[in-house]
Structures are given as structure tokens and as C-alpha cells.
């Protein structure tokens, strides 16, 4: 494990305007995972460990941050997991594209249960998942699919997405609404959680490439704009967008996550950095990787910690507030 102390002064050195009142003194640490794992998504687990998808090794990875040790749980033949989240049952739920199924891993027994997609959707290219307030899992598939799994009954339903290919990130708002973004389709979507119908919302301008989405505590939707290097905020009630450009990046805004204090975390492929955006002061702070080509594709956190997967370096990264 490698630790680096970082502060907002690093952001100032990059020419950013970070307000001193919102500056974050932080410790950045890195944890190596097995070579060739290509960790794609992460999920801080209830027991203090961290789950990650070892995409190129067909496994769910488990990191113990106290010891730095990792464990891999094989998900099945030809597995190629993408996303992982913590379910209401405290289990790991995975979008498992290789087997075209949603996978559940019991953290106690390590048992793997698969929920295959309907045969009408044979190659969804599963991406990301979220749970609604009723305990139903909703998922996206980049080949033009979105759907849901009822863990109680095991029933899996899927629908064709508007405008075909592109569904990517997905989120649940505090009031239980479910939204996803379409990278190739260049729009965001609200799902009717009863009927499964999809209602499209256009971005503030064409060609932004919405990649991931997260809701804050007020129900505002924060969206990473991959093609333009911007972060957008959509107010579903007022139907109004606001947009902020990432400093010095014309493209490459990938992952997004809003923490328990409504601070917005992003990853910037162009700057090879994790970014923190304070909506109150409208300022950015930068936490660049110590290695080239980090390629952090997804981030999640718990109070005081922001975790990401450096798919390009076979490491997990955590930013801890000091």
C-alpha cells in the first residue's frame, strides 16, 4: 500500500481556484490488486472491506484495506463483470456481461447466484445497477437494454432503450425515482418503476456523451459529460440544466459520485486525476494519480472515504479526508 498526502494546494498549483474554506486535506492511498485483474468498478462493503470487479479475470475481488490482502471469487465460465454495488441484503450485486446475467455474491458463504436476462436479450453488454426504494434492482446494458430484477421472486424483466445503444450509468434519487444515462444515445432517461416505461430528457447541448449519473440529497442529478469534459446538473422539478467545465479538460469526464455532504467527485481521464467539485463555491480540487494511465472508470464512497478503481494500473485508490 502506498500513501500520499494531498491538499488543495495541489489544485492551486494546477491553476484552479479552490476556496480555502472548502479545501480538502486528504490522504491518498493505493492498493495493488492481482496483475491483469483490470478492476473496473468498486463498492465499499458493509464490513469495512472493498469489493471490486476483476473484469479481465471473471471475478469479484475483495480487498481488506487493513492488510492490503485481496481475494477473488470466480463468477463462472466466461465471466466478464462490469459493475458492483451493495444490496439492501448486504450482498454484492454485479452486472455480469460475460454470462449476460445479474450476479449475487453472498459475502458470508461466497455463493454465487445468477439471474439471467430474458432470452430476447441475449447480449445486453451489462453495465451498471442501482436499487430502488422497494428493493428492486435496476440495470443498464450498453447494447440498448435496461431492466429490473426482483430479488424476492427472482423475476427478471428487460426493455429496449429509446434510440438503441448506449445505456450506461444509473442512479436512484432520495424519493425513489430511477434515472439512467445513454452515452451513445446522448440523453438521460427517467424510468417509470411501475410500468418500466422510459421518458427521455435531452442534454443541455448535443454531443456531450452522458456517461455516469448520481443523485444528491436534494434530488438533483449530476451527470458526467464524457465527450465535452464537463459536469452537468439537472433539476427534474424545474427541468433546468447547469453545466461546469472541468479545468483544462476538453473531454474525458468519466465517473461521478456525490458524497454524504453533497460534494461531487469526478474522474478526469485527460488530467489523469480524481476531481472534487464543491457546488457551493463552484470550485474544483484535483487529486492526480502518481502513475500514468490510471483510467478510473467508477467511484463510490462512504463517510470520509472516496474509493476508485485504477483499471489502467491494477490498483484501487482511496482518498481519505484528514
Language-model features: where?
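Beta-rich, blade/repeat-based domains predominating
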Residues: 35-46, 76-89, 120-134, 163-175, ...
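A short loop-to-beta-strand structural motif that recurs across blades of beta-propeller domains
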Residues: 59-61, 100-104, 145-148, 187-190, ...
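Short loop/turn motifs that cap or connect beta-strands within the blades
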Residues: 32-33, 73-75, 115-118, 159-162, ...
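Short loop/turn segments that connect beta-strands within beta-propeller blades
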Residues: 64-68, 106-110, 150-154, 192-196, ...
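Blade-level signature of beta-propeller repeat domains, shared across WD40, Kelch, NHL, RCC1
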Residues: 293-322
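Bacterial N-terminal signal peptides
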Residues: 7-19
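Conserved beta-strand positions in repeat-built beta-propeller and related beta-rich domains
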Residues: 51-56, 92-99, 137-143, 179-184, ...
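A short helix->beta-strand "capping" segment at the edge of beta-propeller domains
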Residues: 24-35
Amino acid at each position: 500500500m502506498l500513501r500520499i498526502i494531498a491538499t488543495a494546494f495541489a489544485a492551486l498549483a494546477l491553476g484552479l481556484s479552490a476556496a480555502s474554506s472548502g479545501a480538502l486535506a486528504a490522504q491518498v492511498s493505493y492498493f495493488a490488486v492481482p496483475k491483469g485483474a483490470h478492476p473496473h468498478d468498486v463498492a465499499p462493503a458493509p464490513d469495512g472491506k472493498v469489493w471490486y470487479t476483476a473484469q479481465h479475470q471473471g471475478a469479484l475481488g475483495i480487498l481488506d484495506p487493513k492488510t492490503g490482502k485481496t481475494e477473488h471469487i470466480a463468477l463462472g465460465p466466461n465471466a466478464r463483470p462490469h459493475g458492483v454495488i451493495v444490496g439492501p441484503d448486504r450482498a454484492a450485486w454485479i452486472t455480469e456481461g460475460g454470462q449476460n446475467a445479474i450476479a449475487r455474491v453472498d459475502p458470508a458463504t461466497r455463493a454465487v447466484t445468477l439471474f439471467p436476462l430474458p432470452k430476447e436479450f441475449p447480449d445486453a453488454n451489462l453495465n451498471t445497477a442501482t436499487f430502488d426504494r422497494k428493493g428492486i434492482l435496476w440495470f443498464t446494458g450498453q447494447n440498448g437494454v435496461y431492466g429490473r430484477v426482483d430479488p424476492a421472486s427472482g423475476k427478471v424483466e428487460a426493455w429496449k432503450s429509446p434510440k438503441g445503444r448506449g445505456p450506461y450509468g444509473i442512479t436512484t434519487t432520495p424519493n425513489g425515482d430511477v434515472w439512467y444515462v445513454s452515452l451513445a444515445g446522448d440523453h438521460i432517461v427517467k424510468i417509470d418503476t411501475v410500468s418500466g416505461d422510459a421518458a427521455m430528457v435531452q442534454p443541455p447541448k448535443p454531443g456531450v456523451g452522458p456517461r455516469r449519473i448520481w443523485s444528491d440529497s436534494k434530488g438533483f442529478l449530476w451527470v458526467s459529460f464524457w465527450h465535452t469534459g464537463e459536469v452537468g446538473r439537472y433539476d427534474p422539478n424545474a427541468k433546468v440544466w447547469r453545466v461546469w467545465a472541468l479545468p483544462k479538460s476538453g473531454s474525458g469526464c468519466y465517473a461521478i459520485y456525490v458524497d454524504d455532504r453533497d460534494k461531487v467527485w469526478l474522474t478526469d481521464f485527460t488530467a489523469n486525476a480524481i476531481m472534487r467539485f464543491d457546488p457551493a463555491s463552484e470550485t474544483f480540487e484535483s487529486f492526480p494519480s502518481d502513475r500514468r494511465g490510471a483510467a478510473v472508470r467508477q467511484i463510490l464512497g462512504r463517510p470520509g472515504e472516496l474509493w476508485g478503481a485504477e483499471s489502467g494500473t491494477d490498483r484501487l485508490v482511496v482518498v481519505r479526508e484528514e
